[in-house]
C-alpha cells in the first residue's frame, strides 16, 4: 500500500460502489495517506445519491399503494405531443418490476435530451413490459386531440404482456376499460411509472419529428418538435402547411 500513487488510488476507487470507495479511502486515510479531498468528493457523491434515492422512493408512493391493495402489474401511462401544431401524439405504457428505481427518472420535460435518450434505453431494458402507440395528425383532426390521446394510451396498454391490473395515468381517465385506473394530477412528476412512460413517449415523438425535419427542413421541426414557437408560426405563414400539420390546430395561422 505504501507505494500507491494518488492516480492509482483514484483508479481503484472508480471501480467500486460509492460506499465501497468511502470505506477503501477511509482505510487509506487511517494509515496516513493524503486522500482527504478524494474522500470528501465521495461523501458528496454519497449525499447526492442518497437524496436521489429518497426522491425516487417518494415517486413510488402510488405504486406501493397499489401493491398494498393486491395489484401485481402496475402500468404508468403518459403521452407526448398533445399541444403541438404538427405531428403525431405518442403514448407509452410501462410496467416496471415492483420496487425498481432507475436513477435520474423524472418528468421527461425536466430532463435534457441526452438524459432522456439514456433513460429511454434503460427503461426498455429493465421494464417487465412496455408499449408505445403513435396516432397521426389526420386522426387527431378527425376525432380531436383528447380522443386521439385516449386511443394512443389504450393502444399502448394493449401491447403490455403481462397485462396491467392497475393503471396510473397523468390526469386522464380512459373509457371502456375495466382495469382499475388511478388518474394523478402532475403524475409524471409524482409517479415513477408515469415518468418512465413520459420518457418513452417523448423520445419516440422527438425522434419522429427529427425525421420529419429532414423531409420538411423549412419548418425547423428538429428544433421545436412541432410546437407553436415564433419560428414555426413564421414558417407556416411563409411556406404554408405541410402534410403533418394538424389542420384543426393551425386555423389561426393560415388564411
Curated annotation (Swiss-Prot):
CDD domains: RNase_HII_bacteria_HII_like. GO terms for biological process: DNA replication, removal of RNA primer; mismatch repair. Its main location: cytoplasm. Gene3D superfamilies: Ribonuclease H-like superfamily/Ribonuclease H. Its EC number is 3.1.26.4. A divalent metal cation binds at residues 78-79, 170. GO terms for cellular component: cytoplasm; ribonuclease H2 complex. Signal peptide: none annotated. It catalyses: Endonucleolytic cleavage to 5'-phosphomonoester. Keywords: Cytoplasm, Endonuclease, Hydrolase, Manganese, Metal-binding, Nuclease. Its cofactor is Mn(2+); Mg(2+). Manganese or magnesium. Binds 1 divalent metal ion per monomer in the absence of substrate. May bind a second metal ion after substrate binding. Residues 72-255 form the RNase H type-2 domain. It is found in: Cytoplasm. HAMAP family: RNase_HII_B (MF_00052_B). Endonuclease that specifically degrades the RNA of RNA-DNA hybrids. This is Ribonuclease HII.
Amino acid at each position: 500500500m505504501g507505494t500507491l500513487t494518488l492516480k492509482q488510488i483514484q483508479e481503484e476507487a472508480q471501480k467500486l460502489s460509492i460506499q465501497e470507495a468511502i470505506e477503501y479511502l477511509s482505510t487509506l486515510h487511517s494509515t496516513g495517506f493524503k486522500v482527504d479531498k478524494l474522500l470528501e468528493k465521495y461523501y458528496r457523491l454519497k449525499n447526492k445519491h442518497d437524496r436521489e434515492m429518497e426522491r425516487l422512493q417518494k415517486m413510488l408512493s402510488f405504486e406501493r399503494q397499489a401493491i398494498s391493495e393486491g395489484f401485481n402489474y402496475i402500468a404508468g401511462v403518459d403521452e407526448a405531443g398533445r399541444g403541438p401544431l404538427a405531428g403525431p401524439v405518442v403514448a407509452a405504457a410501462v410496467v416496471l418490476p415492483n420496487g425498481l428505481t432507475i436513477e435520474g427518472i423524472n418528468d421527461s420535460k425536466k430532463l435534457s435530451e441526452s438524459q432522456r435518450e439514456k433513460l429511454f434505453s434503460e427503461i426498455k431494458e429493465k421494464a417487465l413490459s412496455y408499449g408505445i402507440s403513435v396516432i397521426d395528425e389526420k386522426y387527431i383532426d378527425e376525432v380531436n386531440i383528447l380522443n386521439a390521446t385516449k386511443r394512443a394510451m389504450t393502444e399502448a396498454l394493449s401491447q403490455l404482456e403481462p397485462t396491467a391490473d392497475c393503471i396510473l395515468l397523468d390526469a386522464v381517465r380512459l373509457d371502456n376499460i375495466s382495469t382499475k385506473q388511478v388518474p394523478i394530477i402532475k403524475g409524471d412528476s409524482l409517479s415513477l411509472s408515469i415518468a418512465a412512460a413520459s420518457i418513452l413517449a417523448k423520445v419516440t415523438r422527438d425522434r419522429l419529428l427529427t425525421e420529419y425535419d429532414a423531409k420538411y427542413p423549412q419548418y425547423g421541426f428538429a428544433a421545436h418538435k412541432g410546437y407553436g414557437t415564433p419560428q414555426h408560426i413564421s414558417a407556416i405563414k411563409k411556406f404554408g402547411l405541410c402534410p403533418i400539420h394538424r389542420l384543426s390546430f393551425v386555423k389561426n395561422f393560415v388564411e
